[in-house]
Amino acid sequence: MFRQKYGNELWLLIGNFKSTIENPKSKISSARILGVDTSLRSTGLGLIQVRGSRLEVVEHGLVKNPAAWPLSRCLGHLHAAIGEILERGEPGTVAIEGIFFCKNVRTAVILGEARGVVIAACAAAGVPVYEYSPRRVKQAVVGFGAAGKEQVVRMVTSLLGLREAPSEDAADALAIAICHAHAGKYDALLGAKEI
């Protein structure tokens, strides 16, 4: 893993992770939330800063694992990437998407393993993890639990004032973080649950 800086963007070779702040460590607060949209090949990450009623993007991007990599290498890479963003971004909490229905048992097991790696990395760093169902995340961001991917991307871009739309996986991660930011006000409605 190494970093390269291009203008105001920080790119990590672990997955084209974009920073929208000149120096992410300069605005550290316990009101930072890391949203994680877990998958084996393309995990979305979205780090936001809560400032009163305003939400600001600190970083967003993807942890990519090539299709040729074996499962163990993918999980190791995901663990290292999560550890790095936890150390660098210093979120106060992490929010992930809950398990959803999978028709393919193998896919469900692999997703569970990837989620386990994320949860373990957070536990090792002492950062609490909360989970939300995909439906709850969409309700919090779009206002409709069965919203499509395009609607989520559009609302995340609008709510966070982004110049460019993030990738679908990064938008999902940012949506999860937004959902958690609102959970303090609407715990019962959004089903906030520490895991």
Language-model features: locations:
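Phosphate- and other anionic-substrate recognition elements at nucleic-acid/protein interfaces
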Residues: 1-195
